[in-house]
Amino acid sequence: MGIEGVGMSALARLLMAEGVAVTGCDLAPGPRARRLGVPVHHGHDPGHLADEDTLVVPTPVPPDHPEVVEARKRGLRVLRRMELLAHFLAQRPSAGVTGTHGKTTTTGMLAAILLEAGLDPWVFLGGELALLPGNARPGRGPRVAEVDESDPLFREVRVSVAVATNLEADHVAPPGERAPNYHESLEALREAMRGFLAGAETVVVPAADPGLLALTEGLPRRLFGPGGEVWAEAVDLSPSCTSFRLVHREGPLGEVHLRVPGKHNVHNALAAALAALALGASPEAISRGLSRFPGVGRRFERVGEVGGAWVVDDYAHHPTEVQATLEAALLSGRRVRVFFQPHRLLRTQELWEAFAQALKGAHEVVVLPVYTAGERGRESPEALSDRIAKRLEDLGRPARRMDKEEALAYARATARPEDLLLFMGAGDVTLLARRLVHEG
């Protein structure tokens, strides 16, 4: 169910590689579902279950969904997405990467290293990686997966090496509210993270993160970053790449030339390097793999140009991610004009001020209505976006709210060769960036 989704389509591909007959359904089937080459039904209907013996559903699907009810009535096995992923990861030596920010990129970097090492990794990714290609790769070697901490079931996943890039208050429901894919509180999120990490043979966390250090006290952990087992020296941040010397406490591991910009990607690379060491990769494979990592789709992805301006698409949807992506964009020396689509009403209600603070370094900001992802909130998508735009104006930054078509027309009419047009958000803002380039 929901086979067009990045996670569900990846699981479908991996099941097919094991000889499992797969069908799917989705409210809006698209290119991912078509690329699988399997029967895909449009919409949801209990009649889709005629010949199946297992139904795999995304976590937010409620137990009273008609297809779930029908599946149980027929005695079919019903698995949540995370339960199926846990089944896959338990079968071989594995690494699971989680965290509020950077987990997709870090997982992709780790996959690139293991490919370079010739270890034939099995990969599950929450994004598109050209090296795979796509969002999944069958393989006979170590199993590498992005483990989404927004899903409370992630605490039950067991891996050999557990990587936590960071942990912040995201996917936490406001007091008194409940929603699928939201933890009841920050403490509930921390407890779930502890459960995931405690089940691993090796835990990889940043040495400079007091919260994760406290959470992993007493666990078999290995630390990266300043004060850890591996760190970066001679870091050079340039508009198109990031170079540094990768150092282990026992000696240098090699020179790394990342093709992706931003200091946050140094953090991600260090996490991937230490996890790769734990899985048996050589220092040479680590430095080469990181240097050949092409980036993940929608992570500072330059999709083209319009009027001489660069058009960049990024998935950032939390204030910390937004600020890191903006800082990377500013390295270009161009006038950075942000087209930001907040994602989810509950998140935006809680973090609207933090979003404004994260965006204030841009030369100009256009705020689109919140992409609700089906949520209901106390305020409308337009009102919340208005609040962010007005706060940015108070902070002295040119800002306005526009709907998607207005924003597209405005970007097209005002793009200049000195601009970098940065489209950010986890919703459908990516389609605007691509339309701008393709339609000119």
What are these regions (language model features)?
Residues 95-97:
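Hydrophobic anchor at the beta1->P-loop junction of P-loop NTPases
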Residues 137-139:
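Conserved motor-coupling elements within RecA-like helicase/translocase cores
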Residues 1-32, 36-40, 51, 55, ...:
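ATP-dependent carboxylate-amine ligase
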Residues 33-37, 41, 47-57, 61-80, ...:
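Acidic, Mg2+-coordinating active-site environments of NTP-dependent enzymes
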Residues 63-65, 152-153, 170-171, 212, ...:
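Short glycine-rich, flexible loops that bind phosphorylated cofactors or substrates
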Residues 142-150, 311-317:
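Switch II (G3) loop of P-loop NTPases
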